């Protein structure tokens, strides 16, 4: 049996561009993609923290070091410049490997400043 597990996550990145007329996708600073292990053309899910929208698209590379998060095409109607997003990719792995699997998680603050990288989501406490 295969399980679908979180592979990579960009937590609370800020949208820098939203271009309705650009070919669909989400352009992501290459440094951010590397930190989360997200590949060019990989399917991603986007969760908009500010308006609750959830949608799927694919990742394309933005210039390394640019801080760009650009939501393009029809998805530009679901995110505005300044919105905070969570961007995730997933992987299917055998059940036997699922419990030892560690995702790549990059945390952001301010104007897309990467603050830390982790291999697990913290345990939620009461």
From Swiss-Prot:
Required cofactor(s): pyruvate
Positions where Pyruvic acid (Ser) occurs in the chain: 25
Subcellular location: Cytoplasm
Key words, A-Z: Autocatalytic cleavage, Cytoplasm, Decarboxylase, Lyase, Pantothenate biosynthesis, Pyruvate, Schiff base, Zymogen
Entry note: cofactor: Binds 1 pyruvoyl group covalently per subunit.
InterPro entries per UniProt: Asp_de-COase-like_dom_sf (IPR009010), Asp_decarbox (IPR003190)
EC annotation from Swiss-Prot or TrEMBL: 4.1.1.11
Active site, renumbered: 25 (schiff-base intermediate with substrate), 58 (proton donor)
Binding site for substrate: 57, 73-75
PTM comment, free text: Is synthesized initially as an inactive proenzyme, which is activated by self-cleavage at a specific serine bond to produce a beta-subunit with a hydroxyl group at its C-terminus and an alpha-subunit with a pyruvoyl group at its N-terminus.
GO biological process: alanine biosynthetic process; pantothenate biosynthetic process
Pfam families: Asp_decarbox (PF02261)
Domain of life, source organism: Bacteria
Annotated signal peptide: none
Pathway the protein takes part in: Cofactor biosynthesis; (R)-pantothenate biosynthesis; beta-alanine from L-aspartate: step 1/1
Catalytic function, reaction form: L-aspartate + H(+) = beta-alanine + CO2
Quaternary structure and interacting proteins, as annotated: Heterooctamer of four alpha and four beta subunits.
Role summary: Catalyzes the pyruvoyl-dependent decarboxylation of aspartate to produce beta-alanine.
UniProt name for this protein: Aspartate 1-decarboxylase
């Amino acid at each position: 049996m295969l399980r679908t597990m979180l592979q990579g996550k960009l937590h609370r990145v800020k949208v820098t561009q939203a271009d309705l007329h650009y070919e669909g996708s989400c352009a992501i600073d290459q440094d951010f993609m590397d930190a989360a292990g997200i590949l060019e053309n990989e399917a991603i899910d986007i969760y908009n923290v500010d308006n609750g929208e959830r949608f799927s698209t694919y990742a394309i590379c933005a210039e390394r070091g640019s801080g760009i998060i650009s939501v393009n095409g029809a998805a530009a109607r679901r995110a505005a410049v300044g919105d905070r997003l969570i961007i995730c990719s997933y992987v299917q792995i055998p059940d036997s490997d699922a419990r030892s699997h560690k995702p790549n998680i990059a945390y952001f603050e301010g104007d897309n400043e990467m603050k830390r990288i982790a291999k697990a989501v913290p345990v939620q406490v009461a």
